[in-house]
């Protein structure tokens, strides 16, 4: 079975044929919506189950690369000149994407989302998620607040800022990552943690609200060691 899967992944034509066949019934039932309204969408070689893609603007680009598996996902794009790129071999379940006003979302290859994750990019800023990241359920990643916070003289103080997540980061359940946060590679973020506007280096265990480093020089493995 592993050899068959590897053959399919390595053969782009076979991947596209299989994904097209897989996706036909869901296109007919309109589980995949509004793709025709996005001329710059590419999702050949992907496997989509109950996926809704909604475009409310112009010049938006959505790329879902080969061997990606999306299930129960919603992608909403508002305004113009937005970019969403999901690289090869991602498995995303229950993902809700909001991208607006010339913003960008980059999800690198082999990212795994267990369920119910919300990613929102706004005000022309970007969110970047590195390779081989693992998200437990109910993760929230936002680079803006979607409303303005003002001083009494009318000065805004909560502009959106980029969020960057390095390769091979593991998020526990109910983690929230807010604007301006940068997380290095090989980090672990504990359940119910809130990270806001700080920069974290590589190989850290981060827990709490606000997120604090409780251990350094660590990494993680999806396999359970004995």
Regions from the PLM with identified roles:
Residues 61-181, 198, 209-210, 216-218:
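Flexible, glycine/small-residue-enriched loop-and-beta-strand segment within the central core
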Residues 1-61, 65-67, 132, 138, ...:
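Terminal amphipathic alpha-helical/low-complexity segments used for targeting or macromolecular assembly
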């Amino acid at each position: 079975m592993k050899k068959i899967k590897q053959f399919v992944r390595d053969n782009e034509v076979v991947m596209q044929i299989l994904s097209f066949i897989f996706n036909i019934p869901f296109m007919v039932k309109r589980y995949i919506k509004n793709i025709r309204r996005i001329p710059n969408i590419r999702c050949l070689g992907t496997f989509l189950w109950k996926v809704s893609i909604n475009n409310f603007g112009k010049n938006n680009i959505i790329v879902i690369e080969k061997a990606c598996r999306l299930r129960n996902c919603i992608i909403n794009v508002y305004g113009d000149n937005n970019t969403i790129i999901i690289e090869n071999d991602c498995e995303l379940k229950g993902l809700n994407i909001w991208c607006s006003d010339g913003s960008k979302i980059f999800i690198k290859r082999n990212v795994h989302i267990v369920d119910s994750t919300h990613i929102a990019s706004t005000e022309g800023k970007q969110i970047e998620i590195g390779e081989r990241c693992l998200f437990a359920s109910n993760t929230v990643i936002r680079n803006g607040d979607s409303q303005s916070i003002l001083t009494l003289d009318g000065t805004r103080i909560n502009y959106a800022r980029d969020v960057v997540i390095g390769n091979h980061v593991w998020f526990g359940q109910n983690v929230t990552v807010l604007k301006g946060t940068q997380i290095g590679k090989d980090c672990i973020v504990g359940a119910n943690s809130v990270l806001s506007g700080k920069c974290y280096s590589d190989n850290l265990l981060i827990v709490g609200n606000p997120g604090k480093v409780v251990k350094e020089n660590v990494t993680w493995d999806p396999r359970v060691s004995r």
